[in-house]
């Protein structure tokens, strides 16, 4: 499943296709969204924001399209006039003079006003996005030490979108390897140096993955252009200490680590 870097890269591709261009045609599959087709025609997409695995498509008239891909949703970009070859079910089509963006198979789609955006249940639950350039290590450290999160094992915490949005399994194992910790640790048990290292890694590793394009390789391994240190490398030698990378299951997800240098 794609994580924050892949979601942000997808948003970048959508923005590159239609941002700042008048919408010449708008179509929604769901009846409750049909009234917005005429309201959005002629408007501009001003930006596309990511909040974890949700996309917020902001329009020049103040409305925002909320969409969450869940397991099966996918966005596509095509040239205007092109007929896509797919068996997926179309949910959203936003068209400009030269490009069209299409959302297939997703079911969690809403149109929100500015006021509704501030009170949306998912957006209220989700934590700050690790790819938000405004988020600092100091703020991450404060969240780690907050009463809500300080007693949580990292094995589960680093998958919890209410802690930090955009984290997922490959980021979890790479972050913990980077700071030399296992998934059983809790923030309340770390010393100052460990807390500082983890606070930085929680931002640095996702941002590194994003800047290395956060894409999938030909085998659809998400994040494959980001060079993994331990993820999917069980049985290989750890590049830091030479120990053998192991694999187990933590919080119902595959977990990779070096038992020799992660303590």
From Swiss-Prot:
Positions annotated as active site in the UniProt record: 2-3, 53, 253
UniProt remark on cofactor binding: Binds 1 zinc ion per subunit.
Positions of FPG-type zinc fingers: 229-263
CDD domains the UniProt entry points to: EcNei-like_N (cd08965)
GO biological process: base-excision repair
Entry keywords, A to Z: DNA damage, DNA repair, DNA-binding, Glycosidase, Hydrolase, Lyase, Metal-binding, Multifunctional enzyme, Zinc, Zinc-finger
Catalysed transformations (reactions): 2'-deoxyribonucleotide-(2'-deoxyribose 5'-phosphate)-2'-deoxyribonucleotide-DNA = a 3'-end 2'-deoxyribonucleotide-(2,3-dehydro-2,3-deoxyribose 5'-phosphate)-DNA + a 5'-end 5'-phospho-2'-deoxyribonucleoside-DNA + H(+)
Enzyme Commission code(s) on record: 3.2.2.-, 4.2.99.18
Function description: Involved in base excision repair of DNA damaged by oxidation or by mutagenic agents. Acts as a DNA glycosylase that recognizes and removes damaged bases. Has a preference for oxidized pyrimidines, such as thymine glycol, 5,6-dihydrouracil and 5,6-dihydrothymine. Has AP (apurinic/apyrimidinic) lyase activity and introduces nicks in the DNA strand. Cleaves the DNA backbone by beta-delta elimination to generate a single-strand break at the site of the removed base with both 3'- and 5'-phosphates.
Protein family: Belongs to the FPG family.
Protein name: Endonuclease 8
Native organism: Salmonella typhi
